[in-house]
Amino acid sequence: IVFNVFVQPADGSGDARAVTNSPNPLFPTTWHPTDDVVAVTENHPATNYNVVLAKPSGRSPDTVTPLPPLLGTSAQELTAAFAPDGKWIAYVSNEGGRSGVYVRPYPGPGVPRLVAPAGFDPTWSPARNELFFMGLDQHLMVVTYRTVGSAFQSDAPRPWSTARAVPRPRGAVGYDGRGFDIHPDGNRVIG
């Protein structure tokens, strides 16, 4: 079995074409806002879940080639999201022993910064300096952040609402299964 990520014009013109060619399950999660790069979660048998990068403008691959990992660590990394300015990427990792939300500069270099010690599905507000994520208790959480030069600083995570989200199916990881999204004005959430 070969797993691929496909790209096609949004208006439906033209054929879909593969931009990856992998023997491992792939789950695309985010486009970079200005570069021609897509972050993809790859479920690799040797390294588990990793965020890898694909370039959709390249020609369709005809051989199975490894995709470059974003971090290349032994920890699981998944469900990446590029910041609206494209200078940061948030993702989930179990580097600290449980699923937490990390942010690092894109394309790097830079040290990953833990912004939430427990959570998943990071999603940037398109209108405010806020990073949303789902807490392990199914509450939508948010951190306010600021960037100073090449430093990313964030406040402590806080609940965005007291309402709880519908739980994900047990074991449902490694796909962009966000149960919420942020309105372009940054004032509303759908979920």
Regions found by a protein language model. Name each.
Residues 1-6, 20-25, 41-53, 72-78, ...:
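A flexible loop/linker signature enriched in serine peptidases of the S9 family
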